[in-house]
Amino acid sequence: MVDPQLDGPQLAALAAVVELGSFDAAAERLHVTPSAVSQRIKSLEQQVGQVLVVREKPCRATTAGIPLLRLAAQTALLESEALAEMGGNASLKRTRITIAVNADSMATWFSAVFDGLGDVLLDVRIEDQDHSARLLREGVAMGAVTTERNPVPGCRVHPLGEMRYLPVASRPFVQRHLSDGFTAAAAAKAPSLAWNRDDGLQDMLVRKAFRRAITRPTHFVPTTEGFTAAARAGLGWGMFPEKLAASPLADGSFVRVCDIHLDVPLYWQCWKLDSPIIARITDTVRAAASGLYRGQQRRRRPG
């Protein structure tokens, strides 16, 4: 029978190996030898009866290891808060919090979250909003801005509002490729822009406009600055947050490709823990998102 008591140092070793990608790096973080890290992982695997780490470069957690990663991260957070509450030198060590957020939110409203969080160490991961919840499932992030309204196991969900996206391009691009309007035939030939291969916003706009998918040439530009520069240079049309598109539309650098827009619901998912830090970050995120559209989003109570 498996002993239900899990060893803290073994969980810490698992978390360090997966976060840093190797046993050597984990050993350096934990101030032990690589063989000691290996032994801790082996002992934990023997205890639970399953392989927890895929020993590749970089190392990654198996499906069985993911719940233990989440446990390790949550245990470390609660331990840090308990030590801080006790006071003394231990309270001087700031807690590290990992958050996943999409680039468009970071470029528009999320930076306001940083105000008043100087007592924590933030590890912000930029992820597409349709995929950021993956880091919650893997136990990497304690919170994520996501389009997923169904709670990840062990998490609460808070609706934030809707981010409005507009299809825009440079005026010369529209004159060259869309002179007769944003028709299905023109959309099939006019290059579009996408953040990466996970970015489905342009596909959503096309389906909304024509009620079907249309294959088209696409440039992939995975930074906010690069995406904007590509649109200004006339490489393609793309979906921009209304806030980012407002100034270029006002000065004539951008024009609307069509009158259709997309409202993308965003949610804040975070660990379901009685944690002052999580509560404070959640309140800060919700306040920062107060400028998002709220009219069309379905209301739901936090999970």
From Swiss-Prot:
Belongs to the LysR transcriptional regulatory family. Pfam families: HTH_1, LysR_substrate. PROSITE patterns: HTH_LYSR. Changing R60E: Leads to dissociation into monomers. It comes from Mycobacterium tuberculosis (strain ATCC 25618 / H37Rv). Contains an N-terminal DNA binding domain (DBD) and a C-terminal regulatory domain (RD). The lineage of its organism: Bacteria, Bacillati, Actinomycetota, Actinomycetes, Mycobacteriales. Residues 23-42 bind DNA. Homodimer. Two types of dimers are identified from the crystal packing: a DBD-type dimer, where the dimer is mainly stabilized by the coiled-coil linker helices, and a RD-type dimer, where RDs contact each other in an antiparallel, side-by-side alignment. This is HTH-type transcriptional regulator LysG. A wide array of epitopes was recognized on Rv1985c in TB patients. Those epitopes could specifically discriminate TB infection from BCG vaccination. These results indicate that the peptide pools selected from Rv1985c have the potential to diagnose TB infection by a method that may be routinely used in clinical laboratories.
